[in-house]
Amino acid sequence: MNGVSFHRLYTPYVKIQIDYGITVDVSVDQNEWADLPFEKYDCVVFNRWLGKLQYNILPVLAKKKIPFIVDIDDYWVLPKYNPAYKFYRAYIKNGIKDSLHYADAVMVTTPQLEEKVKEFNQNVTIIPNALDYNQSQWKAETEHPFTIGWVGGLSHTEDLKLLSDKIKPICEKYGARFLMCGFHENVPEWATMEKAITGEPRHKRPEWFQTRVGTKANEFGKYYSEIDICVAPLQKTQFNRYKSELKILEAAAYKLPIFVSAVEPYTNHRDNLGCFFVKNNDWSEIGKLIKSDKVKEVGEINYQYCDQHHNLDTINKKRVDLLRKVVG
């Protein structure tokens, strides 16, 4: 199960089944979707599109008068540097646009994405991301040196270039470690991302730089237990504008402060005093926070803000209200 399905479908609907007594059946195998007994369901919810079987399944739902909701958390037009660009352009982009157009309702993560989706469907509801803090991945405890950390995937090569020559002087001055989480040793792009941080080839990796290998969506959260300050650089692009603020929430789960590029969608958290907005690519404020000895205090502020504005119970109520409205 990928991260999107885990956060947008699995986590919220497991809790909905428990809290609301609503029966939720889950299928993650596309090969079985064509044979599902759709007539037994009041509503179908899926992320983005239904893959290769979409144009077989949508007519079945229409014939049986079963409403469906599309949950989407990012833009369907990828930048050319994204590893999935060609595949999306050839096979996925138009499928997503069609699913949005025919959906009875669409759930999105941010006002920015709501604006874009309304080009295809006016029945759009903002359902922000939220984490279930009771999951074990958000409860790990570790002993570690003071650490600045980044957690992410392969598509962030261009974003990490924003940290070039920025992290090294901070780590060396304050004796901090930098931890890159999501790493895969034999993938060339990761070597590029590492060099963007260290300025050195892998065989000259400095002592202050360490990595953690990529893992499953229900396990990666534990990496935040090794971090004291998070960073989330993000290029100002149309694609990134329609992403969500999930990295801020993940940092908040471990009561960590986070430094983010001052671009949308991160600026949706402009009132979050546990989140620092980096302008003109000047990351030196990280050092000032370390020196102030208020790292934990500011991390607590991030947690309190996210618990108020991205509370899973509150957001799930909104989710259930929409489900009931669509079902009628």
Which residues are covered by each model-predicted region?
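Conserved catalytic-core segment of nucleotide-activated headgroup transferases in glycan assembly
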Residues: 1-21, 131-136, 141-225
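Carbohydrate-associated surface elements
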Residues: 112, 130
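N-terminal pre-catalytic "stem/leader" segment of glycosyltransferase-like enzymes
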Residues: 1-50
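Membrane-proximal helix-turn-helix segments that form the acceptor-binding/catalytic region
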Residues: 60-63, 87-105
